[in-house]
Design a protein with these regions (language model features):
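Bacterial Sec-dependent N-terminal signal peptides
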Residues: 1-22
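Sequence-structural signature of mature extracellular/luminal beta-sheet repeat domains
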Residues: 19-297
């Protein structure tokens, strides 16, 4: 009995140590404000960092992809004619995966700008318009397919009536995993075995446990807030966007707000040399915000 009690106490102490709250006041520098890097765009979206810490992002109305070079603090055009890329994420091999919704496609783009169309539809039907994507370490990808009908879509006819979350495995097989009101931002973590997804029109963000390749638990409500884009830091805090950037603890409690002087903040990611600079896409502009915390790998 004593041994069982000791084991139980050791387990409790271990759990408390692992659940110990982060000192959030030390996550961000006092008095530091986001810095606008450029405001020459129409609508910025989909930031994702490469292995060097440079951040690629889209200007969907102008059909371009740019990147922020952290060494020079300059924004450089990467690609014109992107299929109207929206959300992006680098895969394990360093290819930029884009949600190119002009024809309801997902693209794979190399650093030397060679394009491969990975996905055009589901079960023989055109996707509504892939919005955001997260690649896992197995070579698969989770992506959202809401419907935001664009002015530049020519002859569009909705063929899929649901708005859903999908998984495409490394062989190209696509599986519908769940359906939402309007799924949007998505981010995951191999380390935490978690996948987060925003149902923006429902005003909710959900979390799944990742159980295996394309296998998820039942979704659980994470917080009563929808989001356009999202990011995770190494502590498991989730960063949501809309009116600036809202930071939630891994337990779903709002702990911080970063104000951005734009009408809409679309997305956010970590980048820079040490993966500790928040790169924020907001309407016609992009911003950087140095922090004391690093993004999760």
């Amino acid at each position: 009995m004593k041994n069982i009690f000791k084991i139980s106490m050791i387990g409790l102490v271990f759990a408390l140590v692992n659940c110990q709250s982060v000192n959030y006041s030390k996550m961000f520098y006092e008095g530091v404000q986001p810095e606008m890097i450029s405001d020459k765009f129409s609508f910025t979206e989909g930031p994702s960092a490469d292995k060097e810490g440079n951040v690629y992002f889209t200007d969907q109305p102008n059909d371009k992809i740019y990147y922020w070079d952290w060494k020079s603090n300059q924004v450089i055009e990467f690609l014109d004619k992107t299929g109207r890329a929206n959300g992006t994420h680098f895969d394990k091999d360093g290819y930029l995966i884009t949600c190119s919704d002009d024809q309801g496609e997902i693209w794979k783009i190399s650093k030397d700008k060679k394009v491969e169309v990975l996905l055009k539809g589901f079960e023989g039907k055109r996707l509504n318009g892939p919005n955001d994507v997260w690649n896992d370490e197995l070579g698969g990808m989770y992506f959202t397919d809401p419907l935001y009908e664009r002015d530049y879509w020519i002859g569009f006819k909705q063929e899929i009536q649901h708005k859903s979350l999908y998984y495409r495995d490394k062989t190209g097989k696509v599986t519908k995993l769940d359906t939402f009101t309007q799924p949007n931002g998505i981010v995951g973590s191999e380390k935490l075995k978690k996948l987060y997804i925003s149902d923006i029109d429902a005003g909710k963000t959900y979390v799944y446990d990742i159980l295996g390749e394309g296998k998820l638990s039942e979704k659980k409500l994470f917080c009563e807030m929808g989001s356009d884009g999202m990011e995770l830091d190494k502590h498991g805090n989730l960063y949501l966007t809309g009116d600036g950037v809202h930071v939630f603890s891994r337990l779903g409690k709002k702990i911080y707000h970063i104000s951005i002087p734009e009408k809409w903040t679309s997305n956010v990611t970590f980048g820079g040399k040490n993966n500790n600079i928040l790169f924020i896409t907001a309407s016609k502009s992009v911003y950087t915000f140095p922090t004391r915390v690093r993004g999760i790998k």
